[in-house]
Amino acid sequence: MNALVRRCVARTGIPSIWRRKCFSSGNEPAESNHVTPMLRHLMYKIKSTGPITVAEYMKEVLTNPAKGYYVHHDMLGEKGDFITSPEISQIFGELLGVWFVSEWMASGKSTAFQLVELGPGRGTLTADILRVFSQLGSVLKTCDISIHLVEVSQKLSEIQALTLTEETVPLERDAESLVYMKGVTKSGIPISWYRDLKDVPTGYSFYLAHEFFDVLPVHKFQKTPHGWREVFVDIDPQSPDKLRFVLAPCATPAEAFIQRDERREHVEVCPDAGVVIQELSQRIASTGGAALIADYGHDGTKTDTLRGFYEHQLHDVLTAPGTADLTADVDFSYLRRMAQGRVASLGPVEQRTFLKNMGIDVRLKVLLDKAGDPSLQQQLLRGYDMLMNPQKMGERFHFFALLPHQRLHVGSQGGKACQSEAPSTSVPGFDELVWH
């Protein structure tokens, strides 16, 4: 790729009107006036090998083991750069816990299952789900459950361990092993940490990916009079301590990811997401279970969605790299195609629809009745509003599921990569929850 970059990538910038519209937020952190360690690293890399793809830029900025954002920042919560749904209200995680138990029951009550979370954050979501498992202990008493967390950040894995594990049981650590940490949850369930989904044991499993896919690196493409051209990141010759976007003057290998009938003028493609979906689909088709994906995204309609967040504010993605989170909306139509017909897919449906179908209003009323403190009641109501309000998270976030075809009594459709037919049996969240 480097040789191709050297031959192909022009030093001519993207038209300024397009750049302003797509990439500049006008919000910069206080550190933006300084050259960050990540910026120095990127400039050295670009000077050595030429401009880099947006996907490579995102990967370096977020996960570089020495200078990456996820390695050195506590990005979650009020003091971080963004707040996720589990940090807002316990109800969110509780309803997801109910979803997994409901699916376990609907698929035959296996004697064992794994709960696998991709990118668990602080561990808050898993903790809320485990609380539901404990509350439904009489239902799950014959089932052996284990927890498996896929986490690349050592710092976050330590936070997750503090949230989830029993302090009296020492953690087993082995940095060289595929399972780099093991322990026992506060409710007595075995828990393990991995760096890659492929390292998680196969078997009947429920997979959870909440705000996981949106941080995977995307390739960006712009339609030009000469065809599709990939967007690269280069050093700005007018400001040597700044970066800018440029277009490749000829085709690059990643162009193969674009659909032949694509009608949008600007496209983002996430090959890493496709790899994860293919792995999930293969596992679910072979050993059963389901995958529940919650993220902000679209169904193949949006164009440029790459953005940065610094202290809960939009932030220019090229300014002070390494100090802000980078994210791009998930293209659920792409995820559906990557399942390649191995499994059935449902959604995406808006978060407010999913949570309403799962009974969030009933759960809120129960908690409000139990909360005698008016301040606690207000906190519950504020959390509900954040999750359900169309202007907040209600319509921005979506739920998407992968399930075995037999769960819906739907055939494989000859391997066609399209959305599954309407299920003959209801699936909670995508339909109204009904306990049997």
Swiss-Prot record:
Protein's cellular compartments: Mitochondrion
A GO cellular component annotation in the UniProt record: mitochondrion
Record-linked SUPFAM superfamilies: S-adenosyl-L-methionine-dependent methyltransferases
Reactions accelerated catalytically: L-arginyl-[protein] + 2 S-adenosyl-L-methionine = N(omega),N(omega)'-dimethyl-L-arginyl-[protein] + 2 S-adenosyl-L-homocysteine + 2 H(+)
Any one GO molecular-function label of the UniProt entry: enzyme binding
Presequence boundaries: 1-41
Record Pfam families: Methyltransf_28
Swiss-Prot/TrEMBL keywords: Methyltransferase, Mitochondrion, Transferase, Transit peptide
Region Disordered: start-end pairs: 413-436
EC numbers on record: 2.1.1.320
GO BP annotation list: mitochondrial respiratory chain complex I assembly; peptidyl-arginine methylation, to symmetrical-dimethyl arginine
Protein role: Arginine methyltransferase involved in the assembly or stability of mitochondrial NADH:ubiquinone oxidoreductase complex (complex I). Acts by mediating symmetric dimethylation of 'Arg-118' of NDUFS2 after it assembles into the complex I, stabilizing the early intermediate complex.
Family according to the record: Belongs to the NDUFAF7 family.
Binding partners and assembly: Interacts with NDUFS2.
Protein name: Protein arginine methyltransferase NDUFAF7, mitochondrial
Organism: Rattus norvegicus (Rat)
